[in-house]
Amino acid sequence: MIQTLSKLKVADNSGAKEVRVIRNLGGSVRKFTGIGDIIVCSVQSATPGGAVKKGQVVKAVIVRTTRELKREDGTYIRFSENAVVIIKEDKSPRGTRIFGPIAREIKEAGFAKIASLAPEVL
């Protein structure tokens, strides 16, 4: 479960390495978010010369969580880390590469471009 002030890894090459959650979008009293949800983040650490700078406020979509996600067929999927992909206003990824696997629920949530860039969709 991702909540306000959680620190997450960035799974793309936008220049950010780690972000901190400022706001969970999708409701005024929403406390937790999961895979496929959009969040507002502050960049905590970034690589020099990247498109995203430290301290910048960005939107991101959650692609991996350590909390298990139950699928409709009864199976569960869980990842070893919490990770996000930074997105633009039109929900397209800011970077050109995605690192690590992502859940197929990302594609079902309307992020087909992120799913096509990922090396593995579980």
UniProtKB/Swiss-Prot annotation:
Name assigned to this protein: Large ribosomal subunit protein uL14
Gene: rplN
GO terms (BP aspect): translation
An example Gene Ontology molecular-function term: structural constituent of ribosome
Family to which this protein belongs: Belongs to the universal ribosomal protein uL14 family.
Keywords for the protein's UniProt record, in alphabetical order: Ribonucleoprotein, Ribosomal protein, RNA-binding, rRNA-binding
Function: Binds to 23S rRNA. Forms part of two intersubunit bridges in the 70S ribosome.
Superkingdom in the source lineage: Bacteria
Keyword Transmembrane: no
SUPFAM superfamilies (UniProt xref): Ribosomal protein L14 (SSF50193)
Tagged with keyword Ribonucleoprotein: yes
Subunit structure, as described in the record: Part of the 50S ribosomal subunit. Forms a cluster with proteins L3 and L19. In the 70S ribosome, L14 and L19 interact and together make contacts with the 16S rRNA in bridges B5 and B8.
Gene Ontology cellular-component terms listed: cytosolic large ribosomal subunit
Organism this protein belongs to: Mesoplasma florum (strain ATCC 33453 / NBRC 100688 / NCTC 11704 / L1)
